[in-house]
C-alpha cells in the first residue's frame, strides 16, 4: 500500500504538531510514503516559519531540521510532469485551491492511475484540498 502524504502532513510530523502521532501510527501500515518532489520546499518553508515564530532552543531547532532530513530521505519523490502541471491548473480553478495544494492532488491522482485507489491512500490536512481529493477519487487515509 502507498501513502501519498502532502507536505503539511510531513510538516506535522517534523514539527511534532497536534495529530502527528496518529499520522505516524497510520503510516506504519503502508509500504511506501510518497510526496510530490516540490514538497521539500513547502516542508522547509513551514519549518523555517515555525522556527522564526516560536524561537525554540538551538538544539530543538536542529532536531527539527534533522527530522525534516530524515522524513524527506525516507519519502519517495513523485516527479512533476507537464500533465500534472496542466491538471493542477484545472484543479486550482475548479476547487479554488492554492497552487501547491493542486499540484499535490494532481500528483496523487497520477499515482493513483498507476497503482489504483485500492492500493493507495491520501493524507492531506486542508479541508478544501481534502474535499477536492475525494471528488477526484482519492481515498482519505485518516478515515477508517
Where does each model-flagged region fall?
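Acidic, PIN/NYN-like endoribonuclease modules and their adjacent C-terminal/linker elements
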Residues: 2, 106, 110-144
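Noncatalytic, solvent-exposed loop/strand surfaces
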Residues: 14, 18-21, 49-50, 67, ...
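Short, well-structured N-terminal submotif of metal-dependent ribonuclease cores
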Residues: 1-40, 50-63, 144
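Short active-site oxyanion
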Residues: 1, 30-33, 74-76, 116-121
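Amphipathic alpha-helical segments within well-ordered protein domains
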Residues: 8, 44, 48, 89-92, ...
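Helix-adjacent hinge/juxtasegments
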Residues: 49-81
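Acidic catalytic patch
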Residues: 39-40, 70-95, 102-107
Amino acid at each position: 500500500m502507498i501513502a501519498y502524504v502532502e507536505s503539511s502532513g510531513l510538516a506535522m510530523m517534523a514539527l511534532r504538531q497536534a495529530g502527528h502521532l496518529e499520522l505516524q501510527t497510520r503510516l506504519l501500515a503502508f509500504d511506501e510514503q510518497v510526496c510530490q518532489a516540490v514538497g521539500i520546499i513547502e516542508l522547509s518553508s513551514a519549518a523555517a516559519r515555525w522556527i522564526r515564530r516560536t524561537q525554540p532552543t538551538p538544539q530543538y531547532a536542529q532536531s527539527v531540521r534533522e527530522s525534516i532530513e530524515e522524513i524527506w530521505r525516507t519519502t519517495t519523490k513523485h516527479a512533476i510532469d507537464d500533465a500534472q502541471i496542466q491538471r493542477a491548473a484545472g484543479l486550482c480553478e475548479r476547487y479554488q485551491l492554492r497552487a501547491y495544494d493542486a499540484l499535490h492532488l494532481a500528483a496523487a491522482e497520477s499515482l493513483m492511475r498507476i497503482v489504483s485507489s485500492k492500493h493507495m491512500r491520501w493524507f492531506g490536512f486542508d479541508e478544501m484540498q481534502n474535499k477536492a481529493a475525494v471528488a477526484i477519487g482519492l481515498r482519505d487515509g485518516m478515515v477508517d
